UniProtKB/Swiss-Prot annotation:
Subunit structure of this chain's protein: Part of the 50S ribosomal subunit.
Keyword set includes Ribosomal protein: yes
Function: Binds directly to 23S rRNA. The L1 stalk is quite mobile in the ribosome, and is involved in E site tRNA release.
The protein, known as: Large ribosomal subunit protein uL1
Family assignment from sequence similarity: Belongs to the universal ribosomal protein uL1 family.
An annotated Gene Ontology molecular function: rRNA binding
InterPro entries given in the database record: Ribosom_uL1_bac-type, Ribosomal_uL1, Ribosomal_uL1-like, Ribosomal_uL1/biogenesis, Ribosomal_uL1_3-a/b-sand, Ribosomal_uL1_CS
One Gene Ontology biological process: regulation of translation
CDD domains found in the cross-reference section: Ribosomal_L1 (cd00403)
UniProt superkingdom: Bacteria
Gene Ontology cellular component annotations, sorted alphabetically: cytosolic large ribosomal subunit
Length: 230
């Protein structure tokens, strides 16, 4: 049996059933931080079955303190909209040329945005973008005439959330280098958005469990009293 590191031994001493406030959880994660700037992540177990359309939880939320990571954005637009997207900081802007580029496997993007008139072109990329969760969607604000704002939102800390098979939803909400108050503000914005996105088909208790963790740190259960409306 492999010998446990000192850090693993310290983590093993933590009570896995203890409920923490967000302040306490951040403090514990800082006590067990790694030598690199870890991502801080929140995970929520929801009382939904996403196999049913009326129990899907999906949307966008802007984190007030940003995510701490560089977001690569591609935009399908022409003319004036293309110029606005470029000025807003898009990493790649194009039309048919961008479609061909993506068909050739160049998909190193975190967000793909399109103007409505470009959906005829983007539609041909369904099999390429769909499996990666990158297909522009009007409900998520990624098909929009206002590409300038969409690019700024993507670059400025807007994250997409989508519930997974077992009713779990998770997202990075910042880095360990963030101040406590910035992590707390992002935690609140994210959990508020999930509570607000409660689907019509959800039955029984909606928010079952919330935990906070870091890239290499322990998973800490958060007291549901910390989540407004849970």
């Amino acid at each position: 049996m492999a010998k446990q590191t000192k850090k693993q031994q310290e983590v093993a001493k933590l009570d896995p059933e203890k409920l923490y406030t967000v302040d306490e959880a951040i403090a514990v994660l800082r006590e067990h931080k790694a030598k690199f700037d870890e991502t801080v992540e929140v995970a929520m177990n929801l009382g939904v079955d996403p196999r049913h359309a009326d129990q899907m939880v999906r949307g966008m939320v802007s984190l007030p303190s940003g995510t701490g990571k560089t977001v690569k954005v591609a935009v399908f637009a022409k003319g004036d909209n293309a110029e606005k997207a470029t000025a807003a900081g898009a990493d790649k802007v194009g039309a048919e040329d961008l479609m061909e580029d993506m068909q050739n496997g160049n998909l190193d993007y975190d967000r793909v945005i399109a103007t409505p008139d470009m959906m005829g072109v983007v539609g041909r990329l369904g099999k390429v973008l769909g499996p990666k969760g990158l297909m522009p969607n009007p409900k998520l604000g990624t098909v929009t005439p206002n590409v300038e704002q969409a690019v700024k939102d993507a670059k400025g800390g807007q994250v997409e959330f989508r519930v997974e098979k077992m009713g779990i939803i998770h997202s990075g909400i910042g880095k360990m280098s963030f101040k406590d108050e910035d992590l707390k503000a992002n935690f609140k914005s994210f959990t508020d958005a999930i509570v607000k996105a409660k689907p019509s088909g959800a039955k029984g208790k909606y928010v079952k469990k919330v935990s906070l963790t870091s890239s290499m740190g322990p998973g800490l259960k958060i007291d549901l009293a910390e989540v407004e409306g849970a």
